[in-house]
């Protein structure tokens, strides 16, 4: 269900929704950063106030304004004067851009909200995986719930549901088998259980063909970054590839289907 396509709106309305989407992305980028840090340190991201990771001082409202607080404080904690990681403003700006890109693709619609939740989950789990090499189940559960709840509003027929659910289970089973075989052959853990569950969610959102391209793209990028490293988290590469396919994958999927004449 699309409320507004941006192409149908006047220029000032387009600017309004773009700015709104960017601010929404900033706010959620800040929240996801905090949530990821708390999850990685076995803390609840629902209870308690935000704190400085250096001095543990509770942060006030003026410390939590996305981007603005970082710039105003000169990139340092107002209490202990220790430098604040540049990761915070970068992720806030980045997720603001991600939000705008999805708005341009989906318009003001339920699909935008669904994709926003999906991107939020990918973003959060990537930050956690980068820090502790684990993908939190909660992010995957939220993504699955968002997908299910969106179905009545995006004109999803039974064929759509069967294809996407089938792709989800297909990817999960295929990578589970591959992981077991590779673990046996190499004598060590290869693909983590979190990665397998993430592929399930990717199949649910993207379907079979776009999901396959996601696997290929994630593997290529991961191989490039893996040079000289003994271990890398795979979740961020899957997430980046999945988001790129979510936004730009339709032409690639259409080309592939036409090539095999489906």
Identify the function of each model-found stretch.
Residues 1-14, 258-262:
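Short, strongly hydrophobic alpha-helical membrane anchors
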Residues 91-98, 139-147, 196-198, 234-239:
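Core segments of transmembrane alpha-helices
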Residues 248-262:
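Juxtamembrane boundary at the C-terminal end of a transmembrane helix
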Residues 32-87:
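Membrane-proximal soluble regions of multi-pass membrane proteins
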Residues 192-194, 225-244:
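Interfacial loop-to-transmembrane junctions
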Residues 21, 112, 117-223, 255, ...:
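Functional transmembrane core segments of multi-pass inner-membrane proteins
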Residues 104-114:
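Transmembrane helix-loop-helix
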Residues 28-33, 95, 99, 150, ...:
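Alpha-helical transmembrane segments of multipass membrane proteins
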